[in-house]
């Protein structure tokens, strides 16, 4: 199974830049989208179906034009779960999950910490999401949690770790949380295969950051350790330019 995660920063804007044609060419089995910024009726369902994705699940935020996640699949899932059931996590449309025979795939959009209030919300979300996943794994051990975590894990994952040491997305508390999350039974699939620097998934729109590859790796496909032996490949697709993020990919037997 080939799974892509992609923060599209507005699905309608991405579509205007050729997203559907790119999707048809890339041809993943499942694609997890974040920051769709649209409701289901604002998305061209039939065009996406014609591209090969009849199974489409959208979970928008209550606030219009904000946040929201989706999963598009070639394969019919056995079950679909929208949100976590925890109100403060769900009103912003931050995760949707599909269950297949051998594994489950979740699209996650973890909050950013753009100011003190949002940082506090992010920390609360992180803690509650960890608890939610700990319980979920008892029921569903084979989990693939794809998405925009809004956290660079290590210095290798950010272009200027010293200057960004006190910036949300690279704070010690955030990085420690990701450490704990991984130690609770997940694998960073990209780093499982690739230990090289200068591999990023997000670039600021400012000052030619993308052209100069001054980026952050904040998008991940985290895979349950139970699936370790089935990991085949994981990589990043920086040439896809429908967003300020780029797609990240994992392939599982």
Question: Residue locations for each model-derived region?
Answer:
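Active-site beta-strand/loop signature of hydrolases that rely on acidic residues for catalysis
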Residues: 7, 23-41, 105, 133-155, ...
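N-terminal, active-site-proximal structural segment of metallo-dependent hydrolase catalytic domains
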Residues: 1-49, 55-57, 61-67, 153
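Structured beta-strand-rich core segments of catalytic domains in phosphoester-bond hydrolases
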Residues: 37, 45-113
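Surface-exposed cleft-lining segments at the edges of enzyme active sites
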Residues: 85-86, 110-126, 162-166
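Metal-dependent phosphoesterases centered on the DNase I-like endonuclease/exonuclease/phosphatase
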Residues: 51-55, 127-214, 218
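Active-site beta-strand termini and strand-to-loop segments that position acidic
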Residues: 74, 98-101, 224-225, 250-253
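Active-site-proximal beta-strand elements of phosphoester/diester hydrolases
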Residues: 1-9, 102-112, 146
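Conserved beta strand-loop-helix elements of the APE1-like EEP
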Residues: 64-80, 197, 209-229
């Amino acid at each position: 199974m080939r799974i892509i995660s992609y923060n599209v920063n507005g699905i309608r804007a991405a579509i205007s830049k050729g997203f559907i044609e790119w999707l048809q060419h890339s041809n993943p089995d499942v694609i997890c989208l974040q920051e769709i910024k649209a409701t289901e009726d604002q998305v061209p369902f039939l065009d996406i179906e014609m591209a090969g994705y009849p199974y489409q699940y959208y979970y928008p935020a209550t606030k219009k034009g904000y946040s929201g996640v989706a999963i598009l699949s070639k394969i019919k899932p056995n079950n679909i779960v929208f949100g976590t059931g925890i109100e403060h996590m769900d009103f912003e449309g931050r995760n949707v999950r599909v269950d297949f025979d051998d594994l489950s795939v979740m699209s996650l959009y973890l909050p950013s910490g753009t100011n003190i209030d949002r940082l506090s919300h992010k920390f609360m979300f992180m803690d509650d999401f960890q608890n939610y996943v700990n319980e979920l794994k008892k029921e569903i051990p084979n989990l693939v949690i794809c998405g925009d975590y809004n956290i660079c894990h290590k210095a290798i994952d950010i272009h200027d770790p010293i200057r960004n040491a006190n910036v949300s997305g690279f704070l010690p508390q955030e990085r420690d949380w990701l450490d704990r999350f991984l130690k609770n039974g997940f694998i960073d699939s990209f780093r499982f295969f690739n230990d090289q620097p200068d591999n990023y998934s997000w670039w600021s729109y400012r000052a030619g950051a993308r052209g100069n590859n001054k980026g952050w790796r904040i998008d991940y496909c985290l895979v349950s350790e139970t699936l370790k032996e089935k990991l085949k490949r994981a990589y990043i697709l920086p040439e896809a330019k429908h967003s300020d993020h780029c797609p990240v990919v994992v392939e599982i037997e």
